[in-house]
């Protein structure tokens, strides 16, 4: 990992740029989302969508998925080499919903991938605009994080369902680049590494030959990404051990699971970006907003502003609560699935409830669902305040190694203290401190035992009025500390299935 001095900001990762100053970053991020908006408008024209249909989030998701699939080179190549029945490798499509005679109809559309690529490039000054594609992937990933639970995936890799707050970005595709790596949680990286090690255990040729050499490079790169997320020397030293292992096996899996648990108190730094559905950028471009001239940021007031004045609709199933559907999408837009509910509620200005209490299923509609009974409603995506997105993991007063916030991975840089029962977490650390990482394990456990739950995170950081775009007057909210702030509490969400 490069030293602090050479770190690029997320926006630079997002736009593939080298070091730029704030104005250049704002301009290149603006160019990126403006391109998404122009592409969306063009697709609505191609598909002859009405204004209302173009604002339907389900249509937005279908169009986003089409362009992501059109540019998925590895999969396209695979599909051409392994033709499967009824799948044309050169075409992409999905459900488009249209309003006909007071009812919603589903229409399955099919397009040439080449045509989609042409429209996308045309909207992006003739470039491939990979950054815009990654941006869409992160929006889909944030939506998945808010919608589904990953208990099954956690258990399969030998991790504990209580580590769900470490799983940000667990559904991001591998090709999501540096911007994707920045938003992945510690648990996500650990899970990817464990899967890799397990394949190596079961398949003797996994690390061998020319392919094995590439695999090894990928393994070490993933280790370095994970190492860069940890903020204490002992955790990083343990990652060096895992990376340098001659022949990764169960000892490494054990070390990684230990590190994932330790991240519940000694939080990793994980980026948060507000990525909005393509239709929102489309609405702004259509209303004459010049993104490149105005500039745009994924971590400031801009996304709150966008949502403040765009009207997006969603299909609603018969027994779903539209307010709950709105909460789901609001959380996805702000990458707040792992944020403390009390902080989210304060910013949003309406109570944000845990997932177990939501009467809503996912945003996407399965192809076998009955459209006869479908209704649509406006998503309420506005907020009362705005706050800066963080990447620090919520460690208190800049001590790199203090308690982050348990069972949440903070999204907003807003002062709060940390309701956590250290006993519950320390119970996960019974037993094994021997082996070659024993001294590091002992040190990590000692740091965790010394973490004080009464410490305050993000000291002095607050939320801002929407009129305060320069963030001059922070309002530091006071929270009722008695209740647990995790969104996953009493969870009954569906599992994420590819």
From Swiss-Prot:
Pfam families: Flu_NP. A motif (Unconventional nuclear localization signal) lies at residues 1-18. It comes from the Viruses. Residues 1-21 are annotated as: Disordered. Late in virus-infected cells, may be cleaved from a 56-kDa protein to a 53-kDa protein by a cellular caspase. This cleavage might be a marker for the onset of apoptosis in infected cells or have a specific function in virus host interaction. Disulfide bonds: none annotated. InterPro entries: Flu_NP. Keywords: Capsid protein, Helical capsid protein, Host nucleus, Host-virus interaction, Ribonucleoprotein, RNA-binding, Viral nucleoprotein, Viral penetration into host nucleus, Virion, Virus entry into host cell. GO terms for molecular function: RNA binding; structural molecule activity. One of its GO terms (biological process) is viral penetration into host nucleus. Coiled coil: none annotated. The keyword Hydrolase does not apply. It is found in: Virion; Host nucleus. A motif (Bipartite nuclear localization signal) lies at residues 198-216. GO terms for cellular component: helical viral capsid; host cell; host cell nucleus; ribonucleoprotein complex; viral nucleocapsid. The keyword Repeat does not apply. Homomultimerizes to form the nucleocapsid. May bind host exportin-1/XPO1. Binds to viral genomic RNA. Protein-RNA contacts are mediated by a combination of electrostatic interactions between positively charged residues and the phosphate backbone and planar interactions between aromatic side chains and bases. Encapsidates the negative strand viral RNA, protecting it from nucleases. The encapsidated genomic RNA is termed the ribonucleoprotein (RNP) and serves as template for transcription and replication. The RNP needs to be localized in the host nucleus to start an infectious cycle, but is too large to diffuse through the nuclear pore complex. NP comprises at least 2 nuclear localization signals that are responsible for the active RNP import into the nucleus through cellular importin alpha/beta pathway. Belongs to the influenza viruses nucleoprotein family. This is Nucleoprotein.
